[in-house]
A protein has these predicted regions:
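Short alpha-helical
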Residues: 16-17, 73-74, 104, 206
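Hydrophobic, well-ordered beta-alpha structural blocks that scaffold small-molecule cofactor pockets
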Residues: 1-52, 57-58
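Conserved acidic residues
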Residues: 33, 63-64, 107, 161
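Short, well-ordered secondary-structure micro-motifs
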Residues: 45-47, 102-103, 209-211
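Generic structural signal for conserved hydrophobic packing positions in ordered secondary structure
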Residues: 13, 65, 89, 136-137
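Phosphate-bearing ligand-interacting subdomains
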Residues: 40-98
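Short amphipathic alpha-helical segments
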Residues: 22-24, 77-81, 123, 194-195, ...
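Structural signal for interior beta-strand "rungs" in well-ordered beta-sheet cores
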Residues: 91-200, 204-207
Length: 213
């Protein structure tokens, strides 16, 4: 009988979002090693904080990595580091999530508790689909974007890279949300949203530009 070798996992970031990640890990397949965190020391959720930098991890190619930070632009920075260092990323998908077999998944993705992802959807690298989000058919979720809790994306929505869609928002079908934008919590999106803006409300209205790096 073949024995499955568990993937040794290091999570980048020891904040609140990482607690949800720990709760969704399949420990039959993953051996949680510890965290990397720029500021914290000691332990987090019972696991050691190993270092403040990937560069300080001994034999770093022996591990899989997951970005445990929800903010899209910070995720993007660590995603680029992992790519450039040729380090392996792992998907963490909660066992309660319902995902169509016709979904295309990248790497480094989080899909949280009670999420639904319907057919012909593409979720790009390092994206976050958070608790109870509903992603309908034909969606495209950009790299490092974060679809927050209880959000509904109706059919054929496209979300650009590094965009945050706040909790309990509803996005009408066939709309495009640009890159590097923020949709405020509880918003109702009835028209396309361009790149680099903050919008909020029901229906959404322009709040400000989002040009901060």
């Amino acid at each position: 009988m073949e024995v499955m070798v568990k993937k040794k996992l290091i999570i980048i970031g020891a904040g609140g979002f990482s607690k949800s990640i720990i709760g969704s890990i399949n420990f039959d397949e993953v051996d949680m090693v510890g965290f990397i965190d720029t500021y914290k020391k000691g332990f987090h959720q019972g696991y050691p904080i190993l270092s403040n930098s990937i560069d300080n991890i001994d034999k770093k190619n022996d591990y899989f990595y997951f970005i445990g930070i929800g903010e899209p632009k910070i995720r993007w920075g660590f995603y680029r580091v992992l790519l450039e260092s040729k380090l392996e990323m792992i998907n963490i998908i909660d066992s309660s999530a319902i995902i169509s077999k016709c979904t295309t998944l990248g790497k480094g993705i989080y899909i949280g508790k009670m999420c639904i992802v319907n057919s012909d959807t593409k979720i790009s690298d390092a994206a976050v689909i958070n608790t109870r989000a509903l992603i309908e058919h034909g969606n495209v979720i950009g790299c490092c974007s974060n679809i927050s809790t209880n959000t509904v994306l109706n059919g054929d929505v496209q979300v650009g890279s590094r965009t945050f869609v706040g909790s309990c928002s509803v996005v009408n079908g066939q709309l495009t949300i640009g890159c590097d934008s923020i949709i405020g919590s509880g918003s109702v999106v009835i028209r396309n949203v361009p790149d680099n803006v903050v919008v909020a409300g029901s229906p959404t209205r322009f709040i400000r530009e989002n040009n901060n790096d």
